[in-house]
Amino acid sequence: MARTGRRAAVGRPARTSSLTERRRVLLAGVRSHTRFYKAFAREVREFNATRICGTLLTLMSGSLQGRSLFEATRVTLICEVDLGPRRPDCICVFEFANDKTLGGVCVILELKTCKSISSGDTASKREQRTTGMKQLRHSLKLLQSLAPPGDKVVYLCPILVFVAQRTLRVSRVTRLVPQKISGNITAAVRMLQSLSTYAVPPEPQTRRSRRRVAATARPQRPPSPTRDPEGTAGHPAPPESDPPSPGVVGVAAEGGGVLQKIAALFCVPVAAKSRPRTKTE
């Protein structure tokens, strides 16, 4: 009995360590998924704003059924979509509003992470691939039954992607046969967004972008005045004005004072009779 107790005592730490290792691997996979969603969402936002295509969107373009990525009028990324029995990692929807027959393409993406992409085809990766393919086929059937009806062609394209946990570098891509259905892609986007259980948090605004926004919102300063040889630098120069017309000068001379100032600017002496009288005179 003592030996049995010792064996049980020895076996407990091993079981605890295996559970700890499994939990550690699971948390590492969750962090990799979150970082992947963030990087993918950044590419989608940049493409919709600037039409610049990133690495992940270029990878998705292989499922667009011969269409160019730049023909898409809008790209939407929806993460962790709750389809009931299944929850695909993310669905990337490409809308083709200018196409007469094609409404859009829904790329159903299942993500698998691995420690290293240089380890080759291991037993763990083969198991992940088998599991991922089953998950994609199940998600495809569920999405077919939930798709809103419509009169345009919509392609459902399942894709399995392996990435490295640290670098998020894509190591392997497996595409299943796409399914062609009739539906409404705009209504499908709204439906998928309502079923999403994870929203990618907005990225914090960088210091450089804040400066750029503040510079565009701040009114421009007037140009600095030129240096005055008499030491009047830093004082704003008087605003330039058009030279007065003769009629205006005549009217000002009758009021007195203005003609004298104009004559002083051109170094022209003014007759004594045109000088305005002051109290000292």
Curated annotation (Swiss-Prot):
Induction: Expressed late in the infection cycle. May participate in nuclear egress of viral particles. Plays a role in the dispersal of several host nucleolar proteins including NCL/nucleolin and NPM1. Since deletion of host NCL/nucleolin negatively impact on nuclear egress, UL24 supposedly acts on this process through its effect on host nucleoli. Residues 236-246 have a biased composition (Pro residues). Keywords: Host cytoplasm, Host Golgi apparatus, Host nucleus, Late protein, Virion. It is found in: Virion; Host cytoplasm; Host nucleus, Host nucleolus; Host Golgi apparatus. It comes from Human herpesvirus 2 (strain HG52) (HHV-2). InterPro entries: Herpes_UL24. It comes from the Viruses. Residues 199-252 are annotated as: Disordered. Coiled coil: none annotated. One of its GO terms (cellular component) is host cell nucleolus. This is Protein UL24. Its main location: virion. Belongs to the herpesviridae UL24 family.
